[in-house]
Structure formats: structure tokens, C-alpha cells
UniProtKB/Swiss-Prot annotation:
Major localization listed first in the record, in broad terms: virion
Keywords assigned: Host membrane, Host-virus interaction, Membrane, Phosphoprotein, Viral budding, Viral budding via the host ESCRT complexes, Viral envelope protein, Viral matrix protein, Viral release from host cell, Virion
Note: Most abundant protein in the virion.
Function: Plays a major role in assembly and budding of virion. Completely covers the ribonucleoprotein coil and keep it in condensed bullet-shaped form. Inhibits viral transcription and stimulates replication. Plays a major role in early induction of TRAIL-mediated apoptosis in infected neurons.
UniProt keyword Iron present: no
GO molecular function, one term: structural constituent of virion
Region (Essential for glycoprotein binding): 125-161
Written domain comment of the UniProt record: Late-budding domains (L domains) are short sequence motifs essential for viral particle budding. They recruit proteins of the host ESCRT machinery (Endosomal Sorting Complex Required for Transport) or ESCRT-associated proteins. Matrix protein contains one L domain: a PPXY motif which potentially interacts with the WW domain 3 of NEDD4 E3 ubiquitin ligase (Potential).
Protein family membership: Belongs to the lyssavirus matrix protein family.
Name of this protein: Matrix protein
UniProt keyword Phosphoprotein, yes or no: yes
Gene coding for it: M
Motif PPXY motif, residue range(s) on this chain: 45-48
Length: 212
């Protein structure tokens, strides 16, 4: 993979188009690593089963969540590219690392929904109150909030895909729902792509705690 160079009128035109779907920011967004040839789908191991039951309130947070993932690509996009970009998140994540596990969960739940067209962009949104539980000594501090925003791009000679990611999380008193999803769903595959770190609960074999 290499950064494209504006050597032809066609590429100049493409750059002008792409510029419209990027935030105005002087800092160059990070690039995803080289795309592998093998893109076989596989189901994640059992530890990726999300929380199904909570018996205690230790290290538990009830959070009002807003998630948005905007996909920009002049020629359309495939989930193969999106999955590969998400595999690089640990290396290029710029937000609060005590809440990176929450960000992964929210991004994947967001991308599991139906996108809405917005110009050349496809926008996935999630607004929900959810319950999260972390393993001991992990997760956000009491009362800590999250405002995370980052742009990540895939750019080579033939294709440009940009992701604009926004996730906010605020602790609230509204009763949330436990985050859960079908094991065969797209979100569960994305969790494994992003190496979501969990730990099986000692109390309940079907419950998992976030480790990040």
C-alpha cells in the first residue's frame, strides 16, 4: 500500500471529490495497513459472547451512547475493506484507552445497523442506553465520560475509503439494556476482527467482562 500521488487530472478530480467528505483537519488521518489476500469469514470463539446477565454492580456502568460511523468512498465500498481498517484500530486509536473496549462494541453495533445515504457518504448511527461491565481494575473511572472522534483512511492506486468515527458515552440514570447480539451476526465478526478483549465471568459461564 502507498499513498496516491496527484500526477493525473483524474486523480486530481478524485481528490476534490474525496475532500468533501473529510473533516477540516490539518492533521493527516492514519492509514490502515496493507490489505491481506485472505479474507475468509470465521466465527469468533465463545469468549466473544457479550453479557447476558448481570448479578452484581461491581465495575458496572449504565451509559447513554451515541455512535456514528460515516463511510466515504467515491466508488462504493465493501465490508472487506472496512473489516481490514478495523483490524488496525489498536495501533491507531487516539481516544481514551480505558474505554477502547466500549468503542469497539459501539462501533460494531453501529455498523450492524442500516446505513443512510448522505451525499457520497453512507452513515451508520446508534443511539441507545447500554449496560457495560468491566473486569476488576479495568474500564473508565467513576463518572468518567467519553468523547471520541477519529478519521481513518484506506488509500491506494485504485480505491479510497475513509471512516469518520464518533462515539460519546455519558453515565446516566436511565435503565439501560445489556448489549447482546446473535453470534452469527456481522457485529460478532467485527468484534473478532478488532480483537475485542473479554474474560468469561467466574459466576456465569455465559457472561463476559470487558478487559479493555
Amino acid at each position: 500500500m502507498r499513498k496516491t500521488v496527484n500526477t493525473t487530472d483524474k486523480m486530481n478530480f478524485l481528490r476534490k471529490i474525496v475532500r468533501n467528505c473529510k473533516d477540516e483537519d490539518d492533521q493527516k488521518p492514519p492509514l490502515a495497513s496493507t490489505l491481506p489476500n485472505d479474507d475468509d469469514l470465521w466465527l469468533p470463539p465463545p469468549e466473544y459472547v457479550p453479557l447476558t446477565e448481570i448479578t452484581g454492580k461491581k465495575n458496572m456502568r449504565n451509559l447513554c451512547i451515541n455512535g456514528e460511523v460515516k463511510v466515504c468512498s467515491p466508488n462504493g465500498y465493501s465490508f472487506r475493506i472496512l473489516r481490514h481498517i478495523l483490524e488496525s484500530l489498536d495501533e491507531i486509536y487516539s481516544g481514551n484507552h480505558r474505554m477502547i473496549g466500549l468503542v469497539k462494541v459501539v462501533m460494531d453495533l453501529t455498523l450492524s445497523g442500516a446505513p443512510c445515504p448522505e451525499g457520497m457518504n453512507w452513515v451508520y448511527k446508534l443511539r441507545r442506553t447500554l449496560i457495560f461491565q468491566w473486569a476488576e481494575s479495568r474500564g473508565p473511572l467513576d463518572g468518567e465520560e467519553l468523547e471520541y472522534s477519529q478519521e481513518i483512511t484506506w488509500d491506494d492506486d485504485s480505491e479510497f475509503v475513509g471512516l469518520q468515527i464518533r462515539v460519546s458515552a455519558r453515565q446516566c440514570h436511565i435503565q439501560g439494556r445489556i448489549w447482546c447480539i446473535n453470534m452469527n451476526s456481522r457485529a460478532c465478526q467485527l468484534w473478532s476482527d478488532m480483537s475485542l478483549k473479554t474474560q468469561q465471568s467466574e459466576d456465569h459461564k455465559n457472561s463476559s467482562l470487558l478487559l479493555e
